[in-house]
Amino acid sequence: MPKKPIIIGVTGGSGGGKTSVSRAILSNFPDEKIAMIEHDSYYKDQSHLTFEERVSTNYDHPFAFDTDLMIEHINELIAGRPVDIPIYDYTQHTRSNKTYRQEPQDVFIVEGILVLEDKRLRDLMDIKLFVDTDDDIRIIRRIKRDMEERGRSLDSIIDQYNSVVKPMYHQFIEPTKRYADVVIPEGVSNTVAIDLINTKVASILEESKKA
């Protein structure tokens, strides 16, 4: 039976630096079998809806995610079996018809705004991190990312932030902070916190290799 991989959950508000923190951990272990799985990949398929309906979907609500499939995939990876992870198309606001093959690893970083919201997912994690970043910084980062990478207009980003992103953060995301083992203020720029986390991960990996 394969050894259980280390599962690290990384969450926080949109634009808060979750991905940067995750990449900082990934880059610290270049010689290890380590990979990141994004909750965003598991947004539900909306191909049955019109484009206008897809645009108006609340993507910051737990119902927007197929977390059941994500949990199923992580359990498969824990068991040592590869999975085919969906690829989400942000320009069309639905899943594409493509997937990518994820092989079993020694460490998985599970990243997303709501990865600590579901107890079943939390229970699979060995380390749970919450990236805590000021609201003003998050909205600036979100505007830059969505305009450059996702083809969004400034007006649509601001409207979505005020009507959906901000209220959903306070209703669903911020409350999951209580489940975190470590809260990281200011994200990846908090080098002390990142170093401590990397030291902990290295320690767990070393113990796992001895077992």
Swiss-Prot record:
Q: What is its main location?
A: cytoplasm
GO terms for CC? cytoplasm
InterPro entries, sorted? P-loop_NTPase, PRK/URK, Uridine_kinase, Uridine_kinase-like
Describe which pathway this protein belongs to, using the record's wording.
Pyrimidine metabolism; CTP biosynthesis via salvage pathway; CTP from cytidine: step 1/3; Pyrimidine metabolism; UMP biosynthesis via salvage pathway; UMP from uridine: step 1/1
List UniProt keywords, sorted A-Z. Answer: ATP-binding, Cytoplasm, Kinase, Nucleotide-binding, Transferase
GO annotation terms (biological process): CTP salvage; UMP salvage
Compartmental location? Cytoplasm
Does the record carry Ubl conjugation as a key word?
no
Q: Which reaction does it catalyse?
A: uridine + ATP = UMP + ADP + H(+); cytidine + ATP = CMP + ADP + H(+)
**Pfam families found in the cross-reference section:** PRK
For this protein, the record's NCBIfam families field holds:
PRK05480.1, udk
Query: Can you tell me which family this protein belongs to?
Result: Belongs to the uridine kinase family.
Name of the featured protein = Uridine kinase
Source species, please? Streptococcus thermophilus (strain ATCC BAA-250 / LMG 18311)
